[in-house]
Curated annotation (Swiss-Prot):
Free-text comment on this protein's domains from its UniProt entry: The 2 adenine-specific methylase motifs of the protein participate in modification of the two strands; the first motif modifies the sequence 5'-GGATG-3', the second motif modifies the sequence 5'-CATCC-5'.
GO MF terms, alphabetically ordered: S-adenosyl-L-methionine binding; sequence-specific DNA binding; site-specific DNA-methyltransferase (adenine-specific) activity
EC numbers for this chain: 2.1.1.72
Signal peptide region: none
Name of this chain's protein: Type II methyltransferase M.FokI
InterPro entries: Ade-mod_methylase_MStsI, Ade_MeTrfase_dom_2, DNA_methylase_N6_adenine_CS, MeTrfase_D12, SAM-dependent_MTases_sf
Gene: fokIM
Organism name: Planomicrobium okeanokoites
Annotated family: Belongs to the N(4)/N(6)-methyltransferase family.
PROSITE patterns linked: N6_MTASE
Motif (Adenine-specific methylase 1): 218-221
Lineage: Bacteria, Bacillati, Bacillota, Bacilli, Bacillales
Length: 647
């Protein structure tokens, strides 16, 4: 779900900081200001995770996905005939009563002016919350089962909320997404075989009671109180019938105000936190426009840690859109690191690999190819919408293969028009992990490739353009600007050097190994072909064609300039839509990724065509969203010709 300050785009950076500085055998990782838990979920595969957030709705998400190590079986509900709780909660009939708090206060019911939800969706949320409370009170569900079901509801609510980013305000007119029906999607729970623990406390109080090895601190940066932006999710989670006020129906939050959002208090609060932290390794995320200055943070860290271990890492900050403009060059996201003179914990590290139930939401494999338009950040929304049983999966515009690598099918056919991309992926499929890594490291040594050696990079680029070996291309990309594919009209690789940014880092190596291992486990065939030349006659009703074509109305260029050396235009779009109509007439399932609107533009052709199929609205952006987010930005969708995901 979207959350201000989400660190989804910094996970690789955090991983690299840990790999560079944590050389001992750390076991316990704590995420002290967890938010929606994206960091804790990411590191659950490696450590025992302690997570905390002062907001109750965040705590529920953490308890469900981090503390919980398995998908609940709801044994008591099954005894009374409720075998599928989500189906029951979505479809059971009810009548609106005086207890339906959201219906009466946040939907246009009985004269209420607030338009956060339609009456249908608000009343369904109310029914679910009242039902969960009743089940819990009657001991039909335990604490973890309650958290699991409530977390599913919390994650589903933003998809049908009539807002532009947060709950600081509702829209005056109904957004198309808000008119859809509330859908409950299962959570995928990773089992790391540790006793993970979740807290719902003030960070400065909790820090005196916990201990571990790695402490990750991501406090609020400025004066905006998170509770005002997420008050409605907090009310849904607590369902405590608060005395709301104001046009937007805010809940009282004076006692919930964070010290980190108050200029006079933030310095003392942060100093207390670092002083009392009983952790050997400390990482702090912060922003160059935060209330604390870089020098203040450095001084506090060095005063309580080992000064010689202090490090600071600066990343360009993709600021969410605001009324207050600043030059992008002035904005940075920081990761601070320091080590304290504290012994490691004595917990025994588990040798078991993490096991993930159902769809691998927090364990999706990410392609090692940085291909513009890649769907890795949307996989946890797209993959659950695929049928459970697929014979042949066709990834018609496979690009970096982010989607195909994460699909369970008896056979996967990945096609793309870009010869070079297909050759790289096919070579990885046919070559052992050891050989791939050895080849890359040999080239790095031969040409002295590094973040600073531009001459070595240029020499290697010249060598590649003469030989065109696929693994050399991948190695070259690792040291290129933004890790991108880019060729000129003579089919020569011409992406410039990625000075001080791009390298074959330990994190990238790990990503590559995981990708190749997954690739070797699947029955994959890579094909270089234009989409209209694919042999669709070989498909039947047990197959699925997934399409992620270039988007007709977006202005962003693809890695090679035209996504595979060919422009995408209205004629190409019509060809593809005709093919999908033909597949539908033959009973073959399809799923199309696209955007209906983008920065004020609408794809009228797609809008009209899609009316005869099912449209699933996706959360396009996960990070740095706020109530100032501009309406009309990309409305990402998945269009399918089926509704039942289990075949």
């Amino acid at each position: 779900m979207r959350f201000i300050g989400s660190k989804v785009n910094l996970l690789d950076n955090i991983q690299e900081v840990i790999e560079e500085n944590v050389k001992d055998d750390a076991h316990v990782f704590m995420d002290l200001f967890s938010g929606t838990g994206i960091v804790g979920e990411n590191f659950k595969k490696d450590y025992q995770v302690l997570s905390n957030d002062s907001l109750y709705f965040s705590y529920i998400l953490l308890k469900a996905k981090i503390e919980n190590n398995s998908i609940p079986n709801f044994s008591e509900l099954k005894k009374i005939g409720i075998k599928e709780p989500l189906h029951y909660l979505e479809n059971e009939e009810f009548e609106i009563s005086h207890e339906f708090f959201l219906t009466h206060n946040y939907s246009p019911y009985m004269g209420c002016e607030r338009m956060y939800f339609t009456v249908e969706n608000a009343s369904r949320i109310d029914f679910i919350r009242l039902t969960l409370n009743r089940w819990k009170n009657e001991s039909l569900i335990n604490e973890l089962e309650f958290a699991y079901l409530l977390a599913i509801l919390i994650e589903a609510v933003p998809f049908i909320s009539n807002i532009s980013g947060t709950y600081g305000a509702y829209l005056k007119h109904w957004d198309k997404r808000a008119l859809g029906k509330l859908k409950l999607r299962t959570l995928d729970i990773g089992n790391n075989h540790y006793a993970n623990k979740t807290y719902n406390e003030d960070a400065n109080s909790l820090i005196e009671k916990v201990y571990g090895d790695i402490l990750y601190i991501d406090p609020p940066y400025n004066g905006r109180q998170y509770i005002s932006n997420y008050h409605l999710l907090e009310t849904i989670a607590l369902y405590d019938y608060p005395e709301i006020y104001g046009k937007t129906g805010l809940r009282p939050y004076v006692e919930s105000k964070s010290l980190y959002c108050q200029k006079k208090e933030v310095g003392n609060a942060f100093n207390h936190l670092i002083e009392k932290a009983n952790f050997r390794h400390i990482l702090v995320s912060y922003s160059s426009e935060g209330l604390l200055l870089e020098e203040e943070i450095e001084s506090i860290l060095k005063s309580h840690g080992l000064p010689e271990t202090y490090r600071i890492y600066k990343m360009p900050y993709r600021k969410y859109k605001s009324k207050h403009k600043q030059e992008a060059s002035e904005l940075h996201e920081y990761i601070f690191y320091i080590q304290k003179d504290i012994a490691l914990t004595n917990s025994v590290k588990s040798n078991k690999k993490i096991e993930v139930g159902k769809h691998k939401t927090n364990s999706y494999i990410k392609s090692p190819l940085n291909y513009v338009g890649g769907k890795h950040k949307l996989l946890n929304q797209i993959v659950p919408l695929f049928p459970d049983k697929i014979d042949t999966f066709v990834d018609l515009f496979s690009g970096g293969f982010n989607v195909g690598i994460n699909v369970n099918a008896n056979k996967i056919i990945a096609t793309d028009i870009n010869t070079y991309v297909v050759e790289v992926l096919d070579t990885m499929k046919k070559t052992s992990v050891e050989e791939v890594i050895a080849h890359i490291e040999r080239r790095i040594e031969e040409y002295g490739l590094s973040k600073s050696n531009e001459e070595g990079f240029k020499a290697f680029r010249n060598y590649y353009n003469k030989t065109k070996k696929p693994l050399d291309l991948y190695t070259l990309i690792c040291y290129s600007f933004n890790y991108q594919f880019r060729f000129n009209n003579n089919q020569e690789y011409n992406n410039p050097f990625g000075r001080e940014r791009s390298q074959f880092s330990p994190a990238l190596k790990k990503k590559l190994v995981l990708f190749i291992e997954a690739l070797h486990e699947k029955n994959v065939q890579f094909v270089c072909s234009e989409f209209e030349h694919f042999n669709f006659s070989q498909l039947d009703q047990n197959d699925l064609v997934y399409c992620d074509p270039p988007y007709l109305i977006t202005t962003g260029s693809y890695n090679d300039g035209n996504r595979g050396f060919k422009d995408w235009n209205r004629l190409q779009e019509i060809k593809l839509l005709d093919i999908l109509d033909h597949l539908n007439s033959k009973g073959v399932y399809f799923a199309l990724s696209n955007v209906l609107s983008h920065k004020g533009l609408e794809n009228e052709l797609l809008l009209e065509w899609s009316k005869k199929y099912n449209i699933h609205h996706l959360q396009h952006s996960y990070s740095n969203s706020s109530h100032n987010t501009t309406r009309g930005e990309s409305q990402e969708v998945l269009i399918t010709n089926y509704t039942n995901y289990t075949k």
